[in-house]
Design a protein with these regions (language model features):
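Loop/turn elements at helix/coil->beta-strand transitions in domains of secreted/extracellular proteins
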Residues: 56-61, 126-132
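Acidic, Ser/Thr/Gly/Pro-rich low-complexity segments that form flexible
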Residues: 140-172
């Protein structure tokens, strides 16, 4: 905390991408107090990411949430807990793996809407007839964070050709 108070925006952005957000975070009132990236564009101190998105009355949406439900565990080196079988999101740490049933429940609410036991009626992205594209969890082993490039990955011919070109144009 650096002592800076952010004034809420009057209207939401069209792009509601929030780094670090997990599926269930999109419905938590006041999530900006937990995530400084969302705090910068939340419309109120008690706003939800989904609520701000729905305030735009979307006719088309893209929704790619879920990667952080497992990715934070993977990128932290396995520091966290696999919460499979534990539906209590209040017990989850930042690097914990979200229970698959919890993920399914929240993802369904985000897209289709419904009733949440604590947050009440939730209007989902597709509930008012909006069309969209959805994505969920990529294979974490295929993301750039876990993809290695071997030492000296360029073929010798390419290196020699590049050196010749540099010499030709006086850069070497």
């Amino acid at each position: 905390n650096i002592g800076v108070t952010l004034t809420p925006q009057a209207t939401a952005y069209n792009n509601m991408g929030v780094p670090g957000a997990k599926s269930f975070h999109l419905l938590i009132p006041g999530y900006g107090s937990l995530n400084p990236y969302y705090a910068r564009h939340a419309t109120s101190p008690t706003a939800t990411v989904l609520g701000d998105a729905m305030s735009k009355n979307p006719t088309f949406f893209t929704n790619w949430i879920g990667a952080n439900d497992v990715l934070s565990y993977a990128t932290s080196g396995g520091i966290g807990v696999d919460r499979t079988g534990n539906p209590n999101i209040a017990a989850y740490g930042i690097n914990d793996i979200t229970d698959p049933q919890v993920f399914e429940f929240y993802y369904n609410l985000i897209i289709n809407g419904g009733v949440h036991p604590n947050f009440g009626t939730v209007t989902g992205l597709a509930q008012n007839g909006a069309k969209g594209v959805v994505a969920t969890v990529p294979s974490v082993t295929s993301i750039p964070y876990f993809t290695t490039v071997p030492y000296n990955a360029l073929p010798a011919e390419a290196t020699a050709t590049n050196a010749s070109a540099l010499q030709l144009y006086g850069f070497l």
